């Protein structure tokens, strides 16, 4: 009963609202986002390409207003900058200081309660969580899209890909399972399937936060396990719940698990991703789904199945290796 209640749309939305207000009234969180050069510059380029003079824009979750400011520089008719936290007062002051406030209307409101007198040409947002869906992006965008977006309107960014990639960690970054530990003179291997260990290997045990420097290399050519187009999807229930994956190793190494990251796609030329192995987006973190260490040679096949209890909650995701 409790599990079903947690997975209901109403409760999911309420929990997401509570979490986001708490997190994004912390100025440090906004400082991290503003300091993320890849994030800021990609959004600036995408907005310059996709927002046109005369557009009506709604900026969902404006925070300190940086996306609304970029949008205002494109000579729109109006930008509605909305946020349900009081940080919007800071955004308003920043806009006034930068003399861009005349094109922006700041509204402290939950997006589901937003009512406008005109339809919008563009939904601008950064509702992207570390595991892509965990800031309730799909539900929030679809609600605005279905109520306010003009036919043929644009969602910026509108397409995404989720990756769970076989990865080798650095020796310093790898934490072996307890049964893999080689302690001089002691044997822990019997704990692998021991019933006494079972209660400690549930829920979030098989995934952990990964420091960016801990990832050494990917073992396969990256391929998304799923993609989503916010202009087309009717709800998060459209996304697959179970995804079998079969990957061929292109770079020999030790498979220590699966690295979780996402790609945000503005158009064919403007995109970014959160993989820690190249242009770093430090304001997003990465999870690792752990696996017993396995040495892989070029041409080997790594097979696994990814299942999603609730796409917005990584603690309900599971990975089973063949």
Give the role of each language-model region.
Residues 2-60, 64-307, 311-322:
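Class I SAM-binding transferase module
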